[in-house]
Design a protein with these regions (language model features):
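Transmembrane alpha-helical segments in integral membrane proteins
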Residues: 73-90, 161-172, 260-283, 456, ...
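Helix-loop-helix units of permease transmembrane domains in multi-pass membrane transporters
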Residues: 21, 81-125, 409-448, 452
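Aromatic- and glycine-rich beta-strand/loop motifs that create alpha-glucan
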Residues: 1-32, 284, 289, 294, ...
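Juxtamembrane/interface segments at transmembrane-helix termini
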Residues: 87, 91, 198-202, 277-292, ...
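Terminal transmembrane helical anchor/hairpin motif
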Residues: 43-55, 182-275, 279, 484-539
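Transmembrane helix-boundary elements of multi-pass transport/secretion proteins
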Residues: 13, 17, 23-95, 353, ...
Length: 539
């Protein structure tokens, strides 16, 4: 084995071990097992001709439905599960070791890509294992392994490879490693899943077109009067479909052309991961081009070291006498006698109580939150405030305004973990008050952005979202330690409840949510806030 292959293997193995040691893995596997149960129970169903035809429940059909479910979920959420491979090196303080190692950037990134792909396949594989176990428990015997696993290899593996490569490339590209990249990917993932249904997909990542064509041929061969249409119906149903006509289908025909196209997606993912080495900074601590330009412009240069001539600090006052530096009349006859009350005696006890100043704490949290936002974000916020006052009745403006503070909300509970200041906050005099102040800042920002719609447009229902969303961000950040959990949950709620105008999940006053929805979000806000504030700090 050459040195490059050895480095690739050990990089992938080390990163995969780190991912598998994550305490959240068990919850993710449990969710995948439950999804396997939903597939077998008929709650996640694939039908043709307006939900009139479905395949016979054999291994090929169940394996295809399971593979489509896994590929769909990996496309939407896999990015957020594998993102952070490079930031984990920075937070773990192993970045200098990687930067100084002889491993090439291409080899290092390919190792990260391999481990992320395998991690997603572990999650998807748990769905396949659970489906096989449930088959046995229902007394139907062990399903045939080849028809069950063939769609998994054809459709899930390429999806996992491409999603991991995109996540790695976003981390290497400047400006896309944070919340902005997560938002852009979410819209791209939705487009990748919707475009095949509309017949306008240049690349069929999930393989929907191939599966539909194969099923359509089987339906027409057994039911000539049927019209399969442009695409099948695939989704979650509260109750299994009844009185459906079944057709026998033995799976997608594996041809050389199909294998070449699906393998090409895997190779494209590897090429994208290798190409990410071009913008990859290899954890270079040198300042960015913005900092370099700022230092070249006229103005105060904060990088200039202070000397005795340039220092603005006052001279040191008298300190306690030491053996090496005698003070007082005995040590220096020409020195004045020290004051009767030495300066260090004015420090007082470190255990003296500190008065809580709520407004001062809120102002500090507000400065911390806004200081981390870019100038573009702040200008956009001002534009949204002005637009809200100009056209307060626009629901489209509401949808955009509810998306704009996402970077701020995602930092509410995860900021201390990312900056390694969580122990300091936990040992401060009022850690719970600090969390309440952070939530208040998260509520004040959307309140300012939505001032026009709230005061002039009559969208008072948005107030429940003002209370709920920052509580969700604070609780999710404190639970996971990263912004990814909140980003996943919130983007789904935003897309379904606001962008898709589903009143049952509307928290932003867009679709006129019923009273039950408003009460539910209000209770959820109270529970999440109390839990996030009172939960003890964990290292």
């Amino acid at each position: 084995m050459s040195s490059a292959l050895r480095a690739w293997f050990h990089t992938a193995l080390s990163d995969l071990r780190t991912r598998l040691r994550d305490r959240r893995l068990l919850m993710m596997v449990a969710a995948c097992v439950y999804l396997g149960h939903l597939v077998l129970a008929g709650r996640i169903e694939l039908t043709l001709v307006d939900r009139s035809y479905r395949g016979a429940a054999n291994a090929a059909w169940m394996g295809t439905v399971l593979s489509l479910t896994a590929a769909f979920l990996l496309t939407l959420f896999g990015f957020y599960l594998v993102r952070g491979a490079l930031s984990r090196e920075r937070q773990g303080r192993t970045a200098p070791l990687v930067a100084a190692s002889p491993v090439r950037s291409v080899t290092y990134l390919l190792g990260k890509w391999t481990s992320g792909t395998l991690f997603l396949l572990v999650l998807a594989g748990s769905m396949a294992v659970s489906l096989a176990v449930l088959f046995v428990l229902r007394g139907e015997g062990l399903p045939a392994p080849v028809p069950l696993l063939t769609p998994f290899l054809l459709f899930v593996v390429p999806t996992a490879a491409v999603v991991t490569a995109v996540a790695l490339a976003f981390e290497c590209l400047p400006g896309l490693g944070g919340t902005v990249g997560g938002i852009l990917y979410f819209f791209g993932a939705v487009a990748a899943t919707v475009a095949p249904v509309l017949g306008a997909a240049p690349v069929d990542l999930l393989g929907m077109g191939v599966i539909h064509d194969s099923m359509s041929q089987a339906v027409l061969a057994q039911y000539p009067e049927a019209d399969p249409g442009a695409m099948f119906s695939f989704g979650y149903y509260r109750a299994p479909a009844e009185q459906l006509k079944t057709f026998q289908w033995d799976g997608v025909a594996v041809t050389a052309d199909l294998l070449a196209r699906r393998a090409g997606l895997v190779l494209a993912g590897g090429a994208l991961a290798a190409g990410a080495a071009l913008p990859f900074d290899r954890f270079d601590p040198s300042p960015s081009w913005r900092a370099t330009l700022r230092s070249a412009l006229p103005g105060p240069n904060t990088s200039t070291p202070k000397t005795e001539a340039t220092s603005t600090e006052p001279p040191a006052t008298a300190g306690p006498p030491t053996a090496g530096h005698p003070s007082g009349p005995e040590g220096r006859p020409d020195a004045p006698a020290p004051a009767e009350s030495a300066p260090w005696s004015l420090l007082g006890s470190l255990s003296a109580p500190v008065a809580l100043r709520p407004f001062g704490l809120f102002a500090v949290e507000c400065r911390r939150a806004l200081r981390r936002r870019s100038g573009t974000w702040q200008v956009g916020a001002l534009v949204l405030v002005g637009a809200g006052l100009w056209i307060p009745g626009s629901t489209g403006l509401l949808v955009v305004a509810w998306l704009w503070p996402l970077p701020l909300w995602s930092d509410l509970g995860a900021r201390e973990t990312a900056t390694r200041t969580a122990p300091l906050v936990a040992s401060s005099p009022y850690p719970r008050a600090q969390r309440v102040a952070a939530w208040a800042v998260g509520a004040a920002v959307p309140l300012a952005l939505l001032a026009g719609p709230l005061l002039l447009g009559g969208h008072w229902r948005a107030l429940v979202g003002v209370l709920f969303v920052p509580a969700l961000g604070l609780a999710a950040g404190r639970l996971s330690g990263t912004p990814r959990l909140f980003e996943i949950v919130y983007l789904v709620l935003w897309y379904v409840g606001l962008a898709s105008r589903q009143a049952a999940l509307d928290f932003g006053g867009v679709a006129h949510a019923p009273p039950g929805t408003l009460v539910g979000y209000g209770l959820a806000a109270a529970v999440l806030l109390v839990g996030a504030v009172t939960a003890p700090h964990t290292a």
